[in-house]
């Protein structure tokens, strides 16, 4: 059987399931966590079945990654994980492992970079993979071998839905976010450039250099770009997922029994 890799953004799945159960006020904390663990395990089992995976891994975030050191305001406004959930992560990891899925928590890398590295390596070897996450940062990786699945909306993301949502082609998303920024992760983008201007730039120019070389570029946009080029460079690096992480394990070790 040809390998098929399932890549689960673990905290993305867990936090969303937990958020629903946390609203059930008539449950004790213990009951709530038990219910969340069961629902996470059920989700993993369903994903194994629906994707027909032969290999699978659920990746957690390590300690603060290079992005936090590279840009001090990265994710600074994001609400911290509830302590009760943080303390119970060992239970969630055990629940996932019981489904046969390998659990991996790097020392100081984000799950996004680990998953991107795995998907990229698999793709280069003509191995299909499914990334399970609601994180839009994975969308630039969509190709004939890499799919992105939203477990909560029960659908796969595609080129048309991306174009409709962001107003740009999938292959230009990184450039789009470098200009417009990403508020959910406190990535600034270029000061004064919003969604409309970012769409104009990426839909009409192949690069920021191409835009600046066009005499027809508006004086306002030219000024914003030239005065804030440093933030464009920083933002582009922040939104670009790494595919060169040294994993320390091979695809063979992710095979399901």
UniProtKB/Swiss-Prot annotation:
Keywords annotated in UniProt: DNA-binding, Endonuclease, Hydrolase, Magnesium, Metal-binding, Nuclease, Potassium
Pfam families: 5_3_exonuc, 5_3_exonuc_N
Free-text cofactor note: Binds 2 Mg(2+) per subunit. Only one magnesium ion has a direct interaction with the protein, the other interactions are indirect.
Binding positions for K(+) per the UniProt entry: 179-180, 188, 190, 193
Free-text function comment from the UniProt entry: Has flap endonuclease activity. During DNA replication, flap endonucleases cleave the 5'-overhanging flap structure that is generated by displacement synthesis when DNA polymerase encounters the 5'-end of a downstream Okazaki fragment.
PANTHER family in UniProt: 5'-3' EXONUCLEASE FAMILY PROTEIN (PTHR42646:SF2), FLAP ENDONUCLEASE XNI (PTHR42646)
Identification of the protein by name: Flap endonuclease Xni
Name of the gene encoding the protein in the UniProt record: xni
